Amino acid sequence: MPSRPRPSFVSHLLPGSLALCGLALACAVQGEERRSLEPMVVTGSYNPSDTFDLPFSVDSIERRQIADGQLGINLSEVLPRVPGLVVQNRQNYAQDLQISSRGYGARSAFGIRGLKLLADGIPASTPDGQGQAATLNLDVAERIEVLRGPASTIYGSNAGGVIQMFSRDGQGAPRVGAETTVGSDGLSRNHLYTEGEGDGVGFLVDASRMDTDGYRDHSAARRDQTFAKLNFRPDADSRLALIYSSLEQNDTEDPLGQTWDAYKHDPRSVTANAELYDTRKSIDHQQAGMNYERYFGEATLQVNAYVGKRSVVQYLSIPRGVASNSQRGGGVVDFDRDFPGGTVRWLQPVSQAPGELNLTVGLDYDQSRDDRRGYQNFNGDQLGVKGELRRDEVDTATSLDPYLQASWAIDAWTLQAGVRHSTMKMEVDDRYLSNGDASGSRRYRKNTPSFSVMYAFTPDLHGYLSAGKGFETPTQAEMAYAPVAANAPDVFNFGLKPATSSQYEAGLKARLWGNTRVNAAIFQIRTEDEIVVASSLGGRTSYQNAGKTLRRGFELGLESELSEHWNANLAYTRLSATYDSDFEAGGKTIGKGKHLPGVPESSLFGELVWKPAEGISMGWEGMYRSQVYVEDSNSEKAAPSYAVFNWRTRFEQRLGAWAFHQLVRLDNLFDRQYVGSVIVGDGNRRYYEAAPGLSWYAGAGVEYQF
């Protein structure tokens, strides 16, 4: 069969280019009078800046959007409104969400990879790039900033994009509150909090518990989260915040993936091995940190420091015969992780320069140390329990990154340039020596520069160009297992190389009719040594380097206050992500032009919000996603495209010192059966994870102000 010609660069980006030209024409006829809808952000620039004036793609999701009719459980509730992001809710709290930005992170079998997660400036990702979205607590979020494109490379390794949450400070009169939510599949969530300010000290204490039976069989979960924050001024020239957070999930059931036939027969079903081995995961995550800021005239010193501990025990469905092999690492993963780190940053305005010139110099230090053990997942005839020791090692990842950034606004021009020197060292101290000593280390070094320039054609139309070079080291989890023969011992994959990338972006930012904001961008990313799945069996995944990949795309974001009572939001992404050279994987040749698995070609999110009166809001949400390939050869059944629609409403009342609110939410209004996420490259062909049908949720809350 003759191969289908690959779409040209022009065919991929022509629609985006036409959209950019249309924006330019629309803005050229706008008057000078306008009302800015742009929020202030610090991600990408370190200095608080209007998103409209920054020469790269950055968005902010505000507190009202995070809280309006949402459940406050998962980032998948709010992140789809950002173009370029794909958020897949696995309906599996043992494996967390899958989030990708312009294709970065799509390969992740669990957790977040390829993206930098931050909370109040403190990393929520380990130095090697592994993160968990659940550690970001939506109950306390003031805003979430999302940076995409070349400018994200200033954040170093594994920063294909940056997602940064900022918690709110305790302010105003002290108050206490409680809310409860119930819903489909046995969902219940209870939330308590107190916050306010007294004697110059702001405080916020928050605790919640979520229970669910899960949509699929064997997917029950309980999640407990706590958060505490104190913020105050030690003196007139400084600010200090002390922050503590925790996440606990005990015996969270893991339903694993589904084959296509099993999914079609019963979307709620699980493979027999999930119940036979009682696949599950327990997480205990605790973290404490501080943010200190001191002003020296016009200059600012910022210091962040944190310490944390994370313990995980995970029971896999590794068959008994494999788990008992003395050359293998068993079927139970058990590790205790300590992760300290900190940042020192100096922000210096240069008043002698023409225009507005700001310099930033900083140093980031991060470390994670895993005391990792592996056990058989059986004891005698009893399956799904911890048996004999099969792996014992200490894995350490350490990064030390100095960086420099300059931003210069002069007349109609804004220029920003930065460079970061990233050093990452991974070490393994093998203490299980009966099958050989697998100790070793690997060091990665790379300079990641970025440059952006913006020109203000009019006060309401800004155009920009951005370029950068990045790199993505493998995570310790990706290096944990080398692709080896069946009778060879499990060894660390020190041969895995980092992926390197060159990114380019061009965009327009426009304000139309005084009430509408539009951001549009076209981009291209070329990557070498892309890290891809080599094999995935029974919950154990090994990785390898492929050749080259090519990603070209277009993003469009729109936010409009249509009238006093109506708001609209739109986020559209068109992305072609393909392999740009042949490579060998799993005994097969993956040909140039094959699509990267886990990356939809088209994504669309739309929202219409009606607020007929104070304290009443109603929203309609729609989301479309094109088909998603599940493995590199693109020969297995792709997860089909789908469109789903949701509806929500929220009511608020005030009575003296009391405030009340209620919410009702319906997801998947038309009860569509669809695959919500995929497990890339699963060796058992269990690629698919079903999403729920029609689901309902209802909640109520009360707050008292002293």
Task: Map each language-model feature to its residues.
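Gram-negative outer-membrane beta-barrel transporters
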Residues: R345-A353, L359, A409, L415, ...
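Face-selective signature of the C-terminal outer-membrane beta-barrel domain
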Residues: R239-S245, S282-L433, T516-I522, E561, ...
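Membrane-embedded beta-barrel scaffold of Gram-negative outer-membrane proteins
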Residues: H191, N291-F296, T300-I318, A456, ...
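Conserved C-terminal beta-signal and adjacent last beta-strands/turns
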Residues: G16, G121, H218, R233, ...
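A beta-strand signature from Gram-negative outer-membrane beta-barrel systems
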Residues: T126, T135-E179
